[in-house]
A protein has these predicted regions:
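Asp-based, Mg2+/Mn2+-dependent phosphohydrolase catalytic module
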Residues: 1, 35, 76-80, 99-106, ...
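N-terminal helical cap/lid subdomain that shapes the substrate entry/recognition surface
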Residues: 1-100
Length: 217
């Protein structure tokens, strides 16, 4: 079984906007509204194209998020502090259902992997959370040169795991990147949607459902 990370295993905490406002305040930009920053970030994230998770990509996204609040833009001032802040486990929280699900699957001998669109900060984060020990294979887009939904990153995971694609179930929170990408590589796929309700037809609202899901397969 393979997992996405952001939005699947961990989430920014308390939110992207809160972390951005926290860092901005340390650099003289006080009382910026986290809710507005969250909205700006979400809009910029939806509009992004060809995002490769480079520092330049992130700097541009941060500038868009702070548009109208800061001059000069963060890319010329405190962006490095934001980038480093998200390398710290205290900027993230493990979903309540993630660790119990991973431990249950590992105890049953299920081979686990990570397939994530991320940058060089991911492995240290997984280590800080002590999650890396559960995964036989960890594939990070910045290291392999391919991002989901490219089937190549899934195929690389299959080879490293030594398991045929059709025998691997991928779990993630993005229909386009995780479900469509996995299926293009002939993986099985399931969407994690903790808010319940999905147009996909193949979804779970808790990672705890995975144990019973594989028991039925």
């Amino acid at each position: 079984m393979s997992f996405d990370v952001g939005g699947t295993l961990i989430q920014p905490w308390p939110s992207v906007g809160h972390i951005y406002a926290e860092v901005a305040a340390r650099h003289g930009w006080n009382n910026l509204p986290p809710e507005t920053l969250n909205q700006n970030f979400a809009a910029a994230w939806r509009a992004k194209e060809s995002f490769q998770h480079t520092q330049e990509d992130w700097a541009d996204l941060v500038d868009q998020t702070f548009a109208g609040f800061c001059a000069p833009p963060p890319s010329q001032t405190f962006f490095p502090a934001i980038y480093e802040r998200f390398a710290e486990a205290t900027a993230w929280r493990i979903y309540d259902d993630a660790l119990p699900a991973i431990e249950a699957l590992a105890s049953k001998g299920v081979l686990l992997a990570v397939i994530s669109n991320w940058d060089e900060r991911l492995r240290p984060l997984l280590q800080q959370f002590r999650l890396e020990r559960y995964f036989e294979t960890i594939l990070v887009s910045c290291e392999v040169g391919f991002t989901k939904p490219s089937p190549v990153i899934f195929q690389l995971a299959s080879r490293q795991m030594g398991i045929a694609p059709g025998q691997i179930l991928h779990v993630g929170d993005s229909l386009a990147e995780d479900v469509a990408g996995a299926k293009a590589a002939h993986f099985q796929a399931v969407l994690i949607n903790r808010d319940a309700g999905s147009e996909a037809g193949e979804w779970i609202n808790s990672l705890r459902d995975l144990e019973s899901l594989i028991s039925r397969s």
